[in-house]
Amino acid sequence: MYTFLALAPILVVLVLLVILRLPAKISMGVAYLVTALLALFVWQASGAQVAAATVNGIIVALTLLFIVFGAILLLNTLKEGGAIVAIRKGFMDISPDRRIQVIIVAWLFCSMVEGSSGFGTPSAIGAPLLLALGFPAMASVMAVLIIQSTPVSFGAVGTPVLLGVWTGINDKPDITQAIAPLSTENYLLQIAGNIGLIHALVGFLIPLLLSGFLTRFFGKNRSFVEGLKVWPFAIFAGLCFTVPYYLVAKYLGPEFPSLVGGFVGLMIVLPLAKRGFLMPKETFDFAPRAKWDEDWLGSLPEERFDDSIAPRFSLVRAFSPYLIVIGLLILTRVIAPLKAFLTGNLTTIEFTNLFGTTISSKIQLAYSPGTILIIASLICILLFKMNGQAVKRSWSSSATTMVAAAPALLLSVPMVQVFINSGSAAEVVNSLPAMPILLAESAAGAFQNAWPLVSPWIGAMGAFIAGSNTVSNMMFAYFQWSTASQIGLDANLAAQVVALQAVGGAAGNMIAVHNVVAACAVVGLMDKEGYVIRKTLVAMTYYAIQAGLIGMGIIFGQIWWWILAVIWPIAFFGIMAMTSKKAVA
């Protein structure tokens, strides 16, 4: 019974948001009430615990809104300054094919952004950029969410592994004994290599899947097959990222795989794409905007382009704000003294032990990607010689969009925090663990030796709930290791199970509710979150199943698991192809 009750908040979100497609501000409001009532009256969490989790959620939501504001401000500033015209022309010169553009921008560029910053920054930068290139708002959001899978485990310079997995496995006597004489630090590097391998084996097909989803849901013909026609370029772009990504993860550690993979991929793919290497014979474009479904459109004003008019700026100058953002993100994350200052006491507002609980929260605006996006926007004023009216329009419209996004985030994140912190109060007899832990324990009891097949789904559940691969790994890394040990796996194979947790947690970012809400907000796509999740849930399902099959093959060494790992992508792409020419979901 408790397992079903623990599942209730997730079911409420799925039914209201995904199936009934109600706005997130309504769905998450109901989910928050259900979660809070269960925590108080069934789990018997203290009122102070629920209140502290709620306040922490509000603080996190406000920091996300700050990033949303910065992302929209940069887009609006580029529009008002005239730089978008040059950026659009630059990408059109590389290829006018939307399938090629989405692979370059979402898969390669946003993966590099994920490697430098993470925590939703790829959506904040990539979705507005695709929108500016003429993509429907919903297509822009779908694309940047689907790629938040392979690069996520090593996002923010390896934070999901260095902080998330490390917190789960460090100072655990049973792990220390099992891995001796290996140190925990070296064991973490082993896990990082495992993560890189599984992601690489699954992720190299993501550009092809992305192209198929683009044509299936947003093409004139609603044809998944139309997206598959770029398979040589898509697989090439997939390998250009995943090969250096895996090599860095295996031999250098978890800090730079996504950053290096994205950068190397761009350096190889961009010049070759401009020369027409592996380009499809037919160019894919969207139907005229007048024929787009209303659900695809955001609230941001439509941009009209006359490609016969020469841009006012060179592509390098127009794109330089994005280069500034990437540069500042890398500097503030990699240079230790600078990072220490930006996250130190002088620049941090901290709320410790809220309402007498162990829950604490902090605000680090100086370290926030939102601040970097605002700095880049201010530089644009000088760079593009903007007048006062243009600056005023960009700031006011950005503030309006942020305010419209606020209700959904201010309800989504507190619901998540209450769910995570729902464990029974210390004085309660027959206390219950927090809801996500109880769900994971129930799954472990049910699946036993098939656990590697299920392991990615636990990671995905953690990310879906928490909106973070890092938090998912913190919650479940030790649980995954313990479960692996209980079914008789040695330390080396248990490291593979922990890797599957991290891989699933990365894939779960595609459907994490407040990630989706924030991504929709930066393109003005309000109240359409459920429509987006219906699409990204399909991609996440593909990723988690494939990771589980590969995990079973690695851990148990049976050839038929590897055969299934080959059959599953073929079957998935075949099923998607058979759904062509049907109404958009």
Where do the protein language model's features map onto the residues?
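Long, contiguous bundles of hydrophobic transmembrane helices that form the permeation core
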Residues: M1-A6, F204-N353, D527-Y531, I545, ...
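Hydrophobic core segments of alpha-helical transmembrane domains in multi-pass membrane transport
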Residues: A8-I19, A31-F41, V68-L73, C110, ...
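Alpha-helical transmembrane segments of multi-pass membrane proteins
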Residues: R99-S111, A137-T150, L163, Q177-P207, ...
